[in-house]
A protein has these predicted regions:
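Cytosolic, membrane-interface loops and tails of multi-pass inner-membrane proteins
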Residues: 1-7, 62-89, 183-206, 254-263
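Intramembrane alpha-helical segments
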Residues: 4-9, 28, 59, 79-169, ...
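Alpha-helical transmembrane segments of integral membrane proteins
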Residues: 5, 17-21, 41, 45-49, ...
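Membrane interfacial helix-start motif at the N-side
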Residues: 5-18, 88, 134, 200-213, ...
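Small-residue-rich segments of transmembrane alpha-helices in multi-pass membrane proteins
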Residues: 20-30, 83, 144-157, 204, ...
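Membrane-embedded alpha-helical segments that form the functional core of polytopic membrane enzymes
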Residues: 23-27, 31-68, 78, 102-110, ...
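Multi-pass membrane catalytic core of lipid/isoprenoid biosynthesis enzymes
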Residues: 49-54, 70-120, 176, 195-238, ...
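Extended hydrophobic alpha-helices typical of membrane-associated regions
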Residues: 222, 226-288
Length: 288
């Protein structure tokens, strides 16, 4: 029982926000690509596969991140009690866990077409080099965005077995979304990060955080408008984006206090709701 508890803690499965932020772009890409005039069984099946894949790969990514960061985590108040940093789980055991999770994720992946499988495998280096970026650049959140939103492109390919401008624009927009919300998240640890020498966009833009996050979210919002235009969505889609705009611009940014770690966590977690809102936006565009 204790081992199960440690495994859940290690993989953050008790904190669904992580894998949901990985899953939402997958669902967006799947929804925008799918023909809802056809039977829905495939849509539900692929949605389930992408959810499972998100959970498995997020879990594996957390383990790799904790292995790489174990010496840093020991020095940060919020992370010092993580299983690897605290010595409750050995690095050897953690590596075995990550291989098992990747193996299970591959079993999920082989349900898709060959193009999707190939593109997914090509993204693996991105997924496992991200934890190193905070040592070398102030832009680790950018690399997280590139990695976390790759599923949007994969989902499109899984339906169409090809790619065009729509998922590419949406993908780049979603990268800015992640860049924004993970910058907010980073302000929880900014004091410790500055002491131990870890880099982040939170540190780089600490003097103008709202301006930078606003630019990120505006870029994401503009990508939604462009996608709607390219997809020939009706006016109902663009009207529904008002809710998305208010969530990003007013709820998340207007009253944001980056010096308040609890508020930063709340604003960060609210992006799970934002993911749902954008999904509904796309459904409106596709169906209504």
């Amino acid at each position: 029982m204790q081992n199960i508890k440690l495994f859940i803690e290690l993989t953050r499965l008790d904190r669904p926000i992580g894998y949901m932020l990985l899953f939402w772009p997958c669902l967006w890409g799947l929804t925008i690509a799918y023909n809802f005039d056809s039977e829905l069984g495939k849509f539900y099946f692929y949605s389930l596969l992408f959810l499972l894949g998100s959970m498995l790969m997020r879990s594996a990514g957390c383990i790799v991140n904790d292995i790489v960061d174990k010496n840093f985590d020991k020095k940060v108040e919020r992370t010092k009690n993580r299983p690897i940093a605290s010595g409750k789980v050995s690095v050897k055991s953690a590596i075995i866990y990550s291989f098992v999770l990747c193996g299970l994720a591959f079993l999920v992946l082989i349900n898709f077409n060959k193009f999707t499988i190939l593109m997914a495998l090509l993204s693996m280096p991105l997924a496992f080099t991200y934890p190193l970026m905070k040592r070398f650049t102030y832009w680790p959140q950018l690399f997280l965005g590139i990695t976390f939103n790759y599923g949007l492109v994969l989902a499109w390919i899984s339906v169409n077995n090809s790619i065009n401008l729509v998922p590419i624009i949406f993908y780049f927009g979603a990268i800015f979304w992640t860049l924004g919300y993970d910058t907010i998240y980073g302000y929880q640890d900014i004091k410790d990060d500055e002491i131990i020498g870890v880099k982040s966009t939170s540190i780089k833009f600490k003097n103008n955080p709202k301006k930078f996050i606003s630019l990120c979210y505006m870029s994401f919002f503009l990508s939604l408008i462009l996608v709607g235009i390219l997809m020939n969505f009706k006016m109902s889609f663009f009207i529904s984006l008002i809710i998305t705009f208010f969530h990003l611009g007013f709820y998340q940014i207007k009253n944001l206090e980056v010096s308040n770690p609890n508020m930063c966590l709340i604003k960060f977690k609210s992006n799970n709701l934002l993911g749902l809102i954008v999904f509904i936006n796309i459904l409106i565009g596709k169906i209504i």
